[in-house]
């Protein structure tokens, strides 16, 4: 009997050993990308990372500047290198917004902070070319492609409101393109839109419906660079396709949307939005959407998702508590009805100082 019991115990023991726990496999589903939930990293291109020290000085920009008012070396290659190193992925970033990289004025100015070059990117000289301090078109393509391979969207910064300041090296644009005064006083709609932000910052006549020619200085620049015929043909094609008049605004819309067609950037942050008429941005968004569709059709293997082009605006002073509207005192404007997916909430800098209970 005792041998029978021992045999049963051994049998049960062997059966227990044979039963192995099957590990539970976690089922993970990748969440779709939503702009409303994006983790956006903003950076000042010149101040982020110097990926190519060989492009740090161009156009004779060797004049001594005030402290931190000159180019410090950050560039497009530097951003790409940090993407490749996993810096952004480690932070959980899925969108990068960086300051403008178009060609800046060659001279320096003093707006009250000492001698300054256009290191920040908001003083455009030529919207059709990149500033060599920031990099080349090839560099930008690699950045966008690398970002997309890492699940990161790219938001460029676009300026339509103004050119760069006037210097000895950078002549003022023609009178049918810009106004040079008065300076904005921000009392109402007119004194916010039909004016210059500051002294010596020519304001594009974004409200103008008058057809204009390319500025002579810009045409001569293109000729010297050997690309005049190409640029003019592209302009002819754009205006023939859209039927738009050749106004200052429409030229710049064409130039900015070229970066979507060429590289497949995912969004624009629009600068100084409230200083132009809102209709400008509705037209801009329409062309951005068309350009994004065109890029997706030409590059089906590179498309990340079915999101449309994203446009966020800098309406300085706008706060989320105002709802859809920005108040000019004599007029309210709903920018969400004029092309924008979202606006920067300037109220947040004050909210951040409040305690949790008061929010």
Map each language-model feature to its residues:
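C-terminal motif of bacterial Sec signal peptides marking the signal peptidase cleavage site
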Residues: 12-15
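The substrate-binding groove and active-site-proximal loops of carbohydrate-active enzymes
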Residues: 62-77, 121-137, 165, 169, ...
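Glycine-rich, histidine-containing beta strand-loop boundary motifs that form or position
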Residues: 99-100, 156-160, 272, 315
């Amino acid at each position: 009997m005792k041998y029978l019991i021992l045999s049963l115990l051994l049998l049960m023991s062997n059966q227990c050993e044979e039963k192995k726990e099957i590990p539970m496999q976690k089922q993970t589903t990748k969440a779709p990308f939503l702009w409303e939930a994006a983790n956006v990293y903003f950076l000042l291109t010149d101040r982020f990372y110097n990926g190519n020290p060989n492009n740090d000085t161009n156009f004779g920009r060797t004049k001594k500047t005030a402290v931190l008012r000159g180019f410090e070396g950050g560039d497009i290659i530097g951003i790409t290198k940090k993407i490749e190193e996993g810096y952004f992925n480690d932070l959980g970033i899925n969108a990068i917004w960086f300051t403008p990289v178009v060609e800046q004025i060659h001279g320096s100015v003093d707006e009250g902070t000492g001698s300054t070059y256009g290191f920040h990117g908001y003083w455009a000289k030529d919207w059709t070319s990149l500033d060599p301090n920031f990099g080349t078109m090839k560099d930008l393509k690699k950045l966008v492609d690398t970002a997309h391979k890492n699940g990161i969207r790219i938001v460029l910064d676009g300026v339509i409101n103004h050119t760069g300041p006037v210097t000895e090296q950078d002549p003022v644009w023609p009178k049918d393109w810009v106004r040079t005064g008065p300076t904005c006083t921000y009392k109402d709609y007119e004194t916010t839109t039909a004016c210059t932000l500051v002294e010596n910052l020519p304001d594009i006549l974004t409200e103008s419906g008058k057809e204009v020619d390319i500025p002579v200085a810009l045409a001569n620049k293109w000729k010297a660079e050997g690309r005049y015929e190409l640029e003019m043909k592209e302009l002819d094609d754009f205006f023939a396709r859209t039927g738009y008049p050749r106004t200052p605004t429409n030229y710049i819309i064409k130039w900015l949307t070229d970066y979507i067609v060429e590289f497949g950037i995912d969004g624009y942050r629009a600068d100084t939005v409230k200083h132009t008429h809102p209709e400008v941005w509705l037209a801009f968004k329409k062309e951005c959407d068309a350009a994004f569709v065109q890029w997706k059709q030409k590059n089906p293997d590179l498309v990340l998702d079915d999101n449309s082009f994203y446009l966020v605006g800098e309406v300085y002073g706008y706060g989320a508590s105002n709802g859809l509207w920005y108040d000019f005192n004599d007029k309210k404007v709903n920018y969400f009805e004029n092309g924008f997916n979202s606006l920067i909430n300037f109220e947040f800098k004050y909210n951040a100082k409040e305690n949790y209970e008061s929010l």
